[in-house]
Amino acid sequence: MKKSILICLGAMLLAACATTNQVALESKASQVTTRNYQTRSFDTTDKINVMNNIVATMQDLGFVIEKADKEIGTISGFSFTNQTTMTVSVRPKGNSILVRANASKGTRAITDPQAYQNFFNALSQSLFLTANEVL
């Protein structure tokens, strides 16, 4: 009887460990996917220019800039229209600049890739126009 109980408990423990590991692996894969659509690389080394264009793009999209730190490379803003907070970080990587946007509505992260695609499309257009001295 005791042997049967020990075998059952052992099997349950092994099953619980396997489930936990699977959840951890799925969570890491999900994080990588999220990071992928939240991040874009731009072929420039001018961090200040990119940050200025991010501020302009966020304002064009209805965000009020709450904080911008050029030394650290972060910009935060809030949209009263749709109650959304967005923080964008900028960091150099080789001969390019990596930009990562993170948006949330209340306490819930925005996970729709299209929202980030819209932001990066507007930012790309702004950088293009600035580079070609249209603005």
Model features per residue range: what roles?
Residues A18-L135:
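Ser/Thr-rich, low-complexity intrinsically disordered terminal regions
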Residues L13-A16:
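C-terminal motif of bacterial Sec signal peptides marking the signal peptidase cleavage site
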Residues M1-S4:
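Positively charged n-region of N-terminal signal peptides that target proteins for export
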Residues I7:
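Phosphate/nucleotide-binding beta-alpha loop and adjacent structural elements of enzyme active sites
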